[in-house]
Amino acid sequence: MSKSKMIVRTKFIDRACHWTVVICFFLVALSGISFFFPTLQWLTQTFGTPQMGRILHPFFGIAIFVALMFMFVRFVHHNIPDKKDIPWLLNIVEVLKGNEHKVADVGKYNAGQKMMFWSIMSMIFVLLVTGVIIWRPYFAQYFPMQVVRYSLLIHAAAGIILIHAILIHMYMAFWVKGSIKGMIEGKVSRRWAKKHHPRWYREIEKAEAKKESEEGI
C-alpha cells in the first residue's frame, strides 16, 4: 500500500481553537494597547467604539484564557522539557540556519516551541488574575486600591510580554516554510516532518506500520 505524501499534524478541533485565539487576541491586543496610549485610542474601533472596547476587552480575554486552557490540556504532554531538547538549544546558530535536522532529534515540538508554549500559558494566567482584580465594575471594588494599581502595572507588563511572544511566534511560523499551511490545512508533507521533527516522524511511521500490521496489509 502506497503512503500518502501528507500526514496529519494538527487536528481540526485544535486548528479551530488556534485561529479563534488568533482572532480574539488581535482584538484584545489592539484595544489593550489603546488603553495605555491615549494617542492610539482609535484602535478601540476594532470593537466599534472606545466604550465597547472597554466593555468587551475583558470578556474576549476570558475567551482567550478558556481556549488556551483547552489547548494546554491537549498539548502539554508534547511540551514537557527533556534532555533531548539540549542539543537544539546548544546549536541554536545551526537551527537558525535551517540545519536543526543535523544537530537535534526533535519530537513533535522543538525546544523553542516548548518555551513559547510555557511563556504564553504563564502570561495568560497572570493576565487572568490581574485582569479580574482590575475589572470594573465587577471585581475591582473588592480589592484594596494599592492592589488594583499594582495589578494594573503587572497586567500591562504581562500584556506587553505576551504581545512580543506572539510576534516572535508569528515570525517563526513564516520563517519555517510549511508551518502556516500545516496550521490551516492540518497536514504537512513527510519531507517537512522528517526534516523539522524527525523523532515525531519516526513515531508516525511506527504507528502506521503497526496499524497496517493489525489490518493484515
UniProtKB/Swiss-Prot annotation:
Residues 37-52, 135-150 are periplasmic. GO terms for cellular component: formate dehydrogenase complex; membrane; plasma membrane. Its main location: membrane. The chain crosses the membrane at residues 12-36, 53-74, 111-134, 151-175. It is a multi-pass membrane protein. Its cofactor is heme. A menaquinone binds at residue 169. GO terms for biological process: anaerobic electron transport chain; anaerobic respiration; formate oxidation; heme oxidation. Heme b 2 binds at residues 57, 155. Heme b 1 binds at residues 18, 169. Disulfide bonds: none annotated. It is found in: Cell inner membrane. Binds 2 heme groups per subunit. Heme 1 is located at the cytoplasmic interface, heme 2 is located at the periplasmic interface. Electrons are transferred from the periplasmic to the cytoplasmic heme. One of its GO terms (molecular function) is formate dehydrogenase (quinone) activity. Keywords: Cell inner membrane, Cell membrane, Electron transport, Heme, Iron, Membrane, Metal-binding, Transmembrane, Transmembrane helix, Transport. InterPro entries: Cyt_b561_bac/Ni-Hgenase, Di-haem_cyt_TM, FDH_cytochrome_b556_subunit, Formate_DH_gsu. Belongs to the formate dehydrogenase gamma subunit family. This is Formate dehydrogenase, nitrate-inducible, cytochrome b556(Fdn) subunit.
